[in-house]
Amino acid sequence: MRAAAHALQQATDFLRGDVAVKGGITTLLKTAHLAEAFRMNFEVHHGGNSLNNVANLHVIMAIRNTEFFEVLLPDSAQKYGLVEDIAVGRDGLV
């Protein structure tokens, strides 16, 4: 796991990932907990589509060491698969 090597070598200030790249919710949670063990934030980047972003948001709500949810703009190309899509409000909150 490259994330562990980066954390051990203090080669980064935070770790990142998403459900599609890290191999699902369980692996994403494990990587977030690894970051927490090294007193780092784990930031979740855009999942590439609406369904992945729902899974990403579930992880974000389950961990303490995160500060933001990345949204790619313009977002129309990544919005599909949900009846009611995720919307970011004027206040920046989901």
Role assignments for model-derived ranges:
Residues M1-V94:
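Shared catalytic-loop signature of beta/alpha-barrel
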